[in-house]
């Protein structure tokens, strides 16, 4: 690790803290690479594509999951030297919490918009967050080297949709490096310097922006200093948890780790302090000095609440301990992922996990399978329902299999979301029908050029299943979608159980709206009929709500030709053999176990292929 002694007296006027706000794929990480390269943050040979996207899965999917940070040294055209702290934020809705905490550490943002595609739904969501944080915005139009780029039309669109002046937008191509110096000048000249109400003489007050686990150094904490100075050897206190630690190392990321003596007001850097788990560091917490604490903490952050739950089970029961260890390791780096043990009659031991959303679920599952070489089955995702019981108490339901007797429940409330969908108007009809089918309530429909912007209220339960995939297929991939949780509302919800040969299969039970139950039940039964192999006896597959069966399919029995050995035409002899076979099958149906293959589970849970 390089050693760099920096005097902590960088004047506030020469520091710029900024983040880059963009929709997935609009070139945010590539722009970050170019800024690092242009300011000499890494030598040419150390540059890799998307330097800040450390996980393989981030590079492959081309998305940023964990917020990363980098400190750049830049000599401006006016001859002055500046320190630029870039916090690279994720663009996807599931990681909105990572975005919000990154934004609160900065004073300004670069709004990156693809000059050929224009404003997308997530651009909007993140821009509004930046505006809520009182950020100064510099608009950057990327990919202007593409033949399809229309900078003038997109500038108008930005002014129309977002309502900010885009006349001075910087035109760049992050891929070729065109216009990057203009971006650096705009950061210095148009974004504000950080403010420090108390200056460097005040008691230490710092915002905990992020934390991650390093195999050699333990937990590393990313901090933004508001007041005071943070130095090595200091005893610090987390104001939220009241935990005390001694600072062992102070440094900055360039993006390599570089040790420094201290961090002063306005600066962003990292510390290590023998912290055992990432869970001990609550993001958004205020760090202060133990001996001379600051009077009041920074306005509080909420811990991330899991929104979607699903069971993860190892395909091979022997992998259970490996799965537990792997989840523990992922939890070290992702405080918003939660899990607890659960057992299922059909799938054995596994974990009930909580996620921020569907992409988060997919990424955790993919990381477990890829980085830890595990084979997993995920049960149908479900959301958190609030149950108001007849005795006046209130309970949360995370797993449909745990639902108490219906008689004890007076009403069930489900979470609703406010969704914003941007789509070319050719696909509007199909999307309106999709939202209608999913019990959506239309709030607003506006046109921006040839694109429609839809605002809908939807039950989250209808979205977690396959809404996003259906939206993409209806719009040929052109529609973009973003949502925020709004509230819980009462719903006519029922628990649908799937019975195979009269036995309920807990892993397939789900909460559905009463109006959609019959169709969902029929689809599920038909799918299982195709997937479960024939046995020596008939197998009924039923979907039931309480005691009422709402759909049924029957898998016919395999037949052995017991009359093959009868040569003569004696009918009574044949009858006797057939009756004997019938009695055997009846007995078998009572005691026979139906083996449901793993593929059947996996396919039945991917009901989105309808």
Swiss-Prot record:
It is a peripheral membrane protein. The keyword Magnesium does not apply. One of its GO terms (molecular function) is guanosine tetraphosphate binding. GTP binds at residues 25-30, 142-145. It comes from the Bacteria. One of its GO terms (biological process) is positive regulation of translation. It is an enzyme of class 3 (hydrolase). Its EC number is 3.6.5.n1. Keywords: Cell inner membrane, Cell membrane, GTP-binding, Hydrolase, Membrane, Nucleotide-binding, Protein biosynthesis. InterPro entries: EF-4, EFG_III/V, EFG_V-like, EFTu-like_2, G_TR_CS, LepA_C_sf, LepA_CTD, LepA_IV. This is Elongation factor 4. It comes from Rhizobium leguminosarum bv. trifolii (strain WSM2304). The gene is lepA.
